[in-house]
């Protein structure tokens, strides 16, 4: 199922968060063109914009942010589970941010799916997460970051 115009904001900090809204995010994850166009103007200068392989970066796009392309759709399709592109992107974000260990993120992800009664996806989710996590390293080494 695809939810059109859906989005999610995640805000985390070592200290208490008094205002959960995020007017100027440091990181944007955009998996489609409408999300990219809508939220790119909000990213702080110097921020990171993680985009999926279905997003087109126009020539006149902002130059004051770092773009990282993750071929999440391609990876998830190659793994035989095209619906796991979001999990691939999660692995990439965890690697880029460096704020959580890979193991802690996978444990939290598995716990969330278990609570939803979807533990049967554990192996596929871990495989997708690992692929996204590893893709970032390859991209940085290959200078695919714009």
Where do the PLM segments sit?
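Active-site cofactor/cluster-binding pocket
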Residues: 4-146
């Amino acid at each position: 199922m695809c939810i059109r115009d859906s989005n999610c904001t995640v805000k985390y900090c070592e200290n208490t968060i008094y205002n959960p809204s995020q007017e100027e995010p440091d990181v944007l994850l955009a998996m489609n063109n409408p999300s990219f166009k809508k939220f790119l103007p909000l990213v702080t200068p110097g921020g990171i914009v993680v985009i999926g392989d279905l997003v087109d970066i126009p020539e006149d796009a902002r130059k004051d942010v770092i773009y990282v392309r993750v071929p999440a759709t391609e990876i998830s399709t190659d793994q035989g589970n095209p619906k796991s592109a979001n999990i691939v992107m999660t692995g990439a974000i965890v690697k880029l941010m460096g704020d959580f260990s890979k193991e802690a993120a996978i444990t939290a992800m598995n716990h969330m799916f278990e609570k939803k009664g979807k533990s049967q996806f554990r192996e596929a989710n871990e495989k997708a997460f690992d692929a996204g996590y590893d893709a970032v390293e390859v991209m940085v080494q290959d200078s695919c970051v714009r």
